Amino acid sequence: MKFVDEAFVRVEAGNGGHGCLSFRREKFIPRGGPDGGDGGDGGSVYFVADKSVNTLVEFRYQRLLRAQNGQPGMGRLRSGKKGEDLIVPVPLGTTVYDKETSELIGDLIEAGDKLCVARGGRHGLGNTHFKSSTNRAPRRTISGEEGEARELKLELKLLADVGLLGLPNAGKSTFIHAVSKATPKIADYPFTTLYPHLGVVRVEEYRSFVIADIPGLIEGASEGAGLGVQFLKHLERTQLLLHIVDIAPLDGSDPVQSIQAIISELEQFSQNLSQKPRWLVFNKIDLLPPDVAQARCQEIINRLNWKGPVYKISAIKRQGTELLCYDLMSFLETNQRSI
């Protein structure tokens, strides 16, 4: 399931250090010649494709990327220190454009691909360079150049790592809203989600994954009923399915029958999809007393003879969602997608 994510960021390379105006001053050498050193080059900003980075979410928190300035030159022919380059990891498949001109700067396709997006300013020259037979005490220096600065647009075709399963109104949209920046339409009636929504879940710095909420499935979806059939095929590209189950349905329906209906649709649509790793997530546990919720969850597990991972959450109250997201991140890192 591919979606285009984008981010905007300003990059500023470091300025070059200025050249030094200095003369040799030592005992018994009253008229020492020039000894001003050169400045250091400014640091550049590089993007590097890193397979451990999945999304552009980091650029929502850091909109300015700045490399170090070069240090000025010093006396005794000492050069200034070069500014440190700024190396920024980006996901594989990132495309970089100049925001103002829409010029394509480059693509980062394979792990280790490196792209200079702002080059550091060239160092200035000390007065030593301007000594001549007619000018033994030059007072001329050259200042360091300014580093490049530009506004960039980054694009990434996202491949969803986790897909959400569940009947309409199971709470999938509420869940994706609770754990990510996605804002799907949420209401208490079936088919609230009319098209896929994508959310980026940020667990820690440079640890994030992509989760997709598709329209709720109903019985017969694999044959064209409801809204989910045209999106079922996209779930085959995900690594893991979260089966969201409403344990307190307002219509009094049986959660076990709801789960079995979804499983049946998966099996009819694709054997590969039905065998994909799937975790059971009981939602809306806040609507029941704790002992009743526990008993109902256990009853469902027993009736299904479920052997896989089980989580109990309240998406609307964000109860249990943090642990689930950390476990999802660990699973995805352990079973990293081959690109």
From Swiss-Prot:
PROSITE patterns recorded: G_OBG, GTP1_OBG, OBG
CC annotations in GO: cytoplasm
Enzyme Commission (EC) number: 3.6.5.-
CDD domains the UniProt entry points to: Obg
UniProt enzyme class: hydrolase
NCBIfam families per the UniProt record, alphabetical: Obg_CgtA, PRK12297.1, PRK12299.1
Family note: Belongs to the TRAFAC class OBG-HflX-like GTPase superfamily. OBG GTPase family.
Function, as annotated: An essential GTPase which binds GTP, GDP and possibly (p)ppGpp with moderate affinity, with high nucleotide exchange rates and a fairly low GTP hydrolysis rate. Plays a role in control of the cell cycle, stress response, ribosome biogenesis and in those bacteria that undergo differentiation, in morphogenesis control.
Protein name: GTPase Obg
Source species: Coxiella burnetii (strain RSA 331 / Henzerling II)
Record lineage: Bacteria, Pseudomonadati, Pseudomonadota, Gammaproteobacteria, Legionellales
Gene field: obg
